[in-house]
Amino acid sequence: MPQYRSRTSTAGRNMAGARALWRATGMTDADFGKPIIAIANSFTQFVPGHVHLQNMGQLVAREIEKAGGVAKEFNTIAIDDGIAMGHGGMLYSLPSRDLIADSVEYMVNAHCADALVCISNCDKITPGMLMAAMRLNIPVVFVSGGPMEAGKVQWGNEVRKLDLVDAMVEAANSAVSDADVDRVERSACPTCGSCSGMFTANSMNCLTEALGLSLPGNGSLVATHADRKELFLKAGRLIVELAKRHYEGEDYSILPRGIATKQAFENAMSLDVAMGGSTNTVLHLLAAASEAGVDFKMADIDRISRGVPCLSKVAPATQKYHMEDVHRAGGVIGILAELDRAGLIHRDVATVHSPSLGAAIEQWDVMRHGEGSEPHRLFRAAPGGVATTIAFSQSMRYPTLDDDRADGCIRDQAHAYSQDGGLAVLYGNIAERGCIVKTAGVDESILKFTGRARIFESQDAAVEGILADQIVAGDIVIIRYEGPKGGPGMQEMLYPTSYLKSKGLGKACALLTDGRFSGGTSGLSIGHASPEAAEGGAIGLAQEGDTVEIDIPNRRIHLAVSDEELAKRRAAMEAKGRDAWKPLGRERVVSPALRAYAAMTTSADTGAVRDVSQVERK
């Protein structure tokens, strides 16, 4: 029988000093011997997705104590990618994922906690905590802060749904008045919660459901709804049960690595493809799988993307639907249920809350249950329509569910948007180890696209070029040296894509980068080109005016330059010595912290995970 980890610091005469310190935190004689549950919160007043989490840790803590555990809360950092976007702050976003993973590992291992509740929400926080959970491999439950309600504004004769991307696009469009920009800005982000579309934060919180590590409804129930409180309370009760099952019942199947198997990662990727999730999820799933010791690679993602249909399109792919609409249609379980009917998921994988994913689908799929059932009540939870930063502040309900699987927010396989999914992996001589495109956000007219390369050595230079009208229809904007090493930090390219839209070029141009894109990006935006330029990737050899061919249906991207010419260019680059594979003319201050990140990170095709062998002495 495995011993409670916490006994390392709570049992025996020699631990008198440690127990004295535990007593100073409020523990009593009755608490020693109980499982010590760490609560990793991520409250901050910087981020709307986390501004309402201040009391969530203690809400979970009280429930843990009622269930027979000892709760100890700590906090991680959390960066708002939207606020950090478009300036030097974005260099810190992806590196913060590793810091979050490290901080959770440090706190849990230093204090010998027995189990973990992860209270996350936004872009790098959920992945960072997920990586930590895989490293630690102790009982864990994820519960997120929930999505923001969609913004709404009267626009002519219609009510228009909004999100932060609309604010960026309209602000860059000189044809839009200052007054209208102000209206959009004030309406785009009305409540606390993670931004309302299928952006990175919501995509990742949905994927924790598919991985089996969070409760049904976690990914889609809006942050403001009173029903979300029950998810936090259930998480508190459940984690104590899981801890006792493992340490007292020798149940290893409920550990993160017992749940998040290769089949579970395949389920998560199938969900991602079906719902047209953020391209960043590829990066984070690869990283989490690496931490879990699961052999899950770009080749698996490519295989899944070819065989799983696109069943849902949510903002930014369309403004018709946001996360609140996904919830009304049955949430993550609703999408998984349609994949299940199509025979496209592994039903037998375990979850923290049900014997198997298949059992969870049977219990929570709204299409299997009638009016008045528990699933119907859960998924009728609606937005309140009132601007607020307060969690659980409203209890509105939809009068009916969206059960239209032919033309609703979630479709069945027969009515899919496409029979191959909303994400695709492209390969070619300019991205030999692959690159990623969110096909759910690409207009059908440009699924095949050939254009002229316009080379920029930084995101800043590209933005200047776009705003100065240097880009015309038919151009392919190449932004390089923005990968994990080259940035460093692999900046998101939301501003370049938003500005292309504002210039009327959203369906007339493409963008290729070794950086990445915000979950709010749509259009022919291809990221994660691997190997990156700073690692000797061929994207660093492309020249102004080269022809680039993009063929999404055939999963191909090609720099129309002969092998001989590429070899000449590579030889010329290598001849530069220490100046090889570095951006020309770019002046960027890179702090020691970011240089340390760059020294150990890897390209996007591996999840930009840390590889310490790069700095270890041989």
Curated annotation (Swiss-Prot):
DNA damage listed as a keyword: no
A single MF term (Gene Ontology): dihydroxy-acid dehydratase activity
UniProt cofactor note: Binds 1 [2Fe-2S] cluster per subunit. This cluster acts as a Lewis acid cofactor.
Assigned EC number: 4.2.1.9
Catalytic activities: (2R)-2,3-dihydroxy-3-methylbutanoate = 3-methyl-2-oxobutanoate + H2O; (2R,3R)-2,3-dihydroxy-3-methylpentanoate = (S)-3-methyl-2-oxopentanoate + H2O
Gene Ontology biological process terms, A to Z: isoleucine biosynthetic process; L-valine biosynthetic process
Binding residues annotated for Mg(2+), in chain numbering: 81, 123-124, 492
Cofactor entry: [2Fe-2S] cluster; Mg(2+)
Entry-annotated residues carrying N6-carboxylysine: 124
Domain of life, per lineage: Bacteria
Catalytic residues, chain numbering: 518 (proton acceptor)
Protein family membership: Belongs to the IlvD/Edd family.
Subunit text: Homodimer.
Protein name: Dihydroxy-acid dehydratase
Organism listed in the record: Chromobacterium violaceum (strain ATCC 12472 / DSM 30191 / JCM 1249 / CCUG 213 / NBRC 12614 / NCIMB 9131 / NCTC 9757 / MK)
Gene: ilvD
